[in-house]
């Protein structure tokens, strides 16, 4: 049984009902409907911390979905799961793929910056100030791009850029 048919959460049930109604009204192909169902089930599983199940649903949604914009969000969510699992290299790969399909995805840029900043902090802890600066500069680059796309969404990142003197670069 699809996850969307066994939701116990009122909000999830409501979303599922509304989404099902929209899928009936909006002219879409059966393939698009199936892709959306897998995507929706992936989001539901992800929100409950069921990452393996979420990934299976997202991979199936990717197999079915042909629209690059919709694929970008599937890829972004796969990146989120890999980030949560500490698999930063994989996460970065999926964020890059998402941005290739949808360059206006500031949240992917932000998450890439957060990973780079984290790697910079790790380098400092290991006494590697040279690599930490490389990671911090990369984080700054991603945050600047995210801020350009969504100016009011990343205030903390903007403050970090100012404090570290990276805002002007």
Curated annotation (Swiss-Prot):
Subcellular locations according to the entry: Plastid, Chloroplast thylakoid membrane
Name of the molecule in the record: Photosystem I assembly protein Ycf3
Membrane topology, as annotated: Peripheral membrane protein
Any Gene Ontology CC annotation: chloroplast thylakoid membrane
Biological function: Essential for the assembly of the photosystem I (PSI) complex. May act as a chaperone-like factor to guide the assembly of the PSI subunits.
Species annotation: Staurastrum punctulatum
Family: Belongs to the Ycf3 family.
TPR repeat locations: 35-68, 72-105, 120-153
Keyword Transcription assigned: no
HAMAP family: Ycf3 (MF_00439)
């Amino acid at each position: 049984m699809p996850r969307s048919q066994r939701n116990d959460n009122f909000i999830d049930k409501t979303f599922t009902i509304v989404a099902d109604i929209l899928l009936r009204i909006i002219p879409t192909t059966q393939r698009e409907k199936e892709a959306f169902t897998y995507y929706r089930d992936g989001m539901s599983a992800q929100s409950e911390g069921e990452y393996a199940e979420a990934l299976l649903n997202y991979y199936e949604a990717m197999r079915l979905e042909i629209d690059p914009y919709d694929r970008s969000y599937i890829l972004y969510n796969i990146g989120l799961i890999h980030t949560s699992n500490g698999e930063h290299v994989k996460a970065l790969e999926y964020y890059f793929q998402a941005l290739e399909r949808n360059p206006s995805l500031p949240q992917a840029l932000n998450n890439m910056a957060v990973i780079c900043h984290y790697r910079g902090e790790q380098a400092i802890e290991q006494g590697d100030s040279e690599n930490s600066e490389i990671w911090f500069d990369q984080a700054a680059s991603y945050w600047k791009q995210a801020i350009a796309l969504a100016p009011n969404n990343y205030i903390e990142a903007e403050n970090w850029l100012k404090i570290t003197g990276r805002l002007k670069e």
